[in-house]
């Protein structure tokens, strides 16, 4: 179990306690997910004692009925959560110990509260890099959930393509996608805001859907994903509404060639930066290198963006079980944008994608 690995890390690194404060990380180790809003939600793991979840009293029964089979302690809004955390820690270990914290997540205020309860403790060690490395390799169970999320993304593309017509807004198309995911697939949460971009808007990669309307002979870019049993999907497709121009076709085919070459190259032994270069070199040789303005890909898992980063300067050697996106893009301001994206997993036989929506340039007939 992953929790056993964390406890072993505590022993090997001479840490006594890990204070896990990121809700996604807590879910990774316990199977229990919640949004604490402004309240305290933490997992405390000890090198030589039983771990416990600490959460609002509102969520105690939910946590006890989840996959988690360990202790759960709660607090009322009228109580001091830090005193209660301290009481439960002291029942398990002494006052003088070394804590490992998630430095990228723990707020300064919460850190100060912990220091106030444990003035003789050390909080200098960071557990984040160990967790990042642990989450880098997906289990077969995790991959199955990622595949499920990918299937939902494929469904979403179909809904989006069918919704395109002259005069419809980007927001309307995005809304139809989100609605149909809920009523037909039972999706409760998208992994990020559904992006639909028509025409020149697609040259702004992270611009959300606007009230801009789709017009004939434009490219329409979709970037979307869902949360499936706690795991994310993230995929992009670009389609032509009406007759694409020669230049629209050209940038699409260059981007598609770059993505396919990277997918074929994503095998054990290649480094992250080498994989980025496979796609980037194709786009650059075609004359569009200045318009590929982001990394080739990012990790995928319980977060829609996580380690590893498929980017120049990252010499990480890719191995079996690593999951990430491959998403080259070409964005020409004032004209159009193209991005084709699939997430997948590195296997001994190559890169297996979680999404399967066709990548030939789809031409949607003009319709009112």
Swiss-Prot record:
GO terms for biological process: proteolysis. Pfam families: Creatinase_N (PF01321), Peptidase_M24 (PF00557). It comes from the Bacteria. Mn(2+) 1 binds at residues 234, 298, 327, 341. The keyword Cytoplasm applies. Its EC number is 3.4.13.9. It is an enzyme of class 3 (hydrolase). Mn(2+) 2 binds at residues 223, 234, 341. Disulfide bonds: none annotated. It is found in: Cytoplasm. It catalyses: Xaa-L-Pro dipeptide + H2O = an L-alpha-amino acid + L-proline. Keywords: Cytoplasm, Dipeptidase, Hydrolase, Manganese, Metal-binding, Metalloprotease, Protease. This is Xaa-Pro dipeptidase.
